[in-house]
Structures are given as C-alpha cells and as structure tokens.
Amino acid sequence: MAVRSVLVPTDFSETSDAALHYGTEMALTLGARLYLMYVPGKTGEHFEANYPLGQFETATRERLSSFLTKEQLERLRPEYALRVGAPADEIVRYAELCDVDLIVMGTHGRSGIAHVLLGSVAEQVVRVAPCPVLLVRAPKRAAATQGAAVKVPPAKRILG
C-alpha cells in the first residue's frame, strides 16, 4: 500500500502535538501530501467566539504551521482544514473528501469509566475511517507506561 497522503487532525493537546510531529515526519519520509486539520468540536474548547470566522481560520492555520519548521513547510506545503462539528464525524468526512491514505492522530489512552463517559474520538475514527489509522500517545504517557521512551524507526522501514 502506497501512502500518498497523510491527514493529521489535532485538538492542540499534548497527544495531538506528538501525532502532528510523527505525521509530519512520515509525510516527509514518504513524500506524501500532508493535511492538517482542527475541529473545535461541539464544546468549542479552543474556539474563541470573539474571532470573526476569517480571523479564526487564519489563527488556526498559523497555529498549525507553528509546529513545522520553515523547511518542512516549504517541502510539504500542507493543506489546512478547519471544520466545526463532532470531531470524529468531521475527521472521517474530510478523509473521504481528500481520499486520504493514512490518518495519524493522538490518543489519550483513557480506560475504564473515563472512557465510557467521555468516549474516544480516536476509537470512533478507527471504527469508520476509510483508510488505516495510526494512533500516537503523548511521549510522557508512553514512557510512563513502558518504563522508557522508545525510538521509532523511520516510516520508510515500517511501510516501505
């Protein structure tokens, strides 16, 4: 399976930041198109009601771009998307619209009652996504649960 495009949805959490960095490196290594997406969700946790929509889109694009170096921005020329709605639904819709080959997203790894009450956007996406989904945990959580940080080999060796 050739990976020609990678979608990285974010909620600007620590786990999403880790996924964004991982997805960016994969896109660079594989020569894939990169799509960066933000969905504020129904609660609008990061949504500023004071922003007119155009300014909010610009602010979102700038924030997404801030995770990439100038060289990465020039090489990848990412596409940016801002969607409002239920995050899992919007991620899946956008992946279908753009014919994405891989979704790379963060997961909080909740379990038990927190998972039952809060649900999991990542789990919802995995269940209905039109392509494979790679879940990435935040580095601190991964290190805490496994005793040490694990260096991930370059994506080309994994996929190619």
What are these regions (language model features)?
Residues 19, 46-48, 92-93, 116-117, ...:
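Short, well-ordered secondary-structure micro-motifs
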Residues 1-54, 139-141, 151-160:
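Small/aliphatic-rich secondary-structure junction motif
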Residues 82-90:
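Charged docking surfaces used in two-component/phosphorelay signaling
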Residues 78-80:
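Rossmann-fold cofactor-recognition segment
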Residues 22, 55-67, 90-92:
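Short, solvent-exposed amphipathic alpha-helices that sit
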Residues 25, 94-144:
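Gly/Ser-rich helix-loop-strand patches that form or flank binding pockets
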Residues 70-76:
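Short helix-capping segments at alpha-helix termini
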